[in-house]
């Protein structure tokens, strides 16, 4: 059994026991979150596609970690002008473990 869920503007294909990194969610570590935007569910070889979401379906996941991704360095410069700018960005993320799919 698997499901396609949407969170943080991205879509993920998940099964029970999967570990995935999603855009930051406001949840405490070791708490459970419900992902209610389930776009599709495959149960017993039968695919149910929502329009736009599957009614009554949800995915329950446990928050394992809140963290930041590796730093992305942005360096801008203009040649011959002595103009340089160096910026860095670390995107926050939430690490989830899928516990169950309810459909």
UniProtKB/Swiss-Prot annotation:
Keywords: Ribonucleoprotein, Ribosomal protein, RNA-binding, rRNA-binding. One of its GO terms (cellular component) is ribonucleoprotein complex. It comes from Clostridium novyi (strain NT). The keyword Phosphoprotein does not apply. This is Large ribosomal subunit protein bL21. Residues 80-103 are annotated as: Disordered. NCBIfam families: L21. InterPro entries: bL21-like, bL21-like_sf, Ribosomal_bL21, Ribosomal_bL21_CS. This protein binds to 23S rRNA in the presence of protein L20. Residues 80-89 have a biased composition (Basic residues). It holds the Pfam family Ribosomal_L21p. PROSITE patterns: RIBOSOMAL_L21 (PS01169). GO terms for molecular function: rRNA binding; structural constituent of ribosome. GO terms for biological process: translation. The gene is rplU. Part of the 50S ribosomal subunit. Contacts protein L20. Belongs to the bacterial ribosomal protein bL21 family.
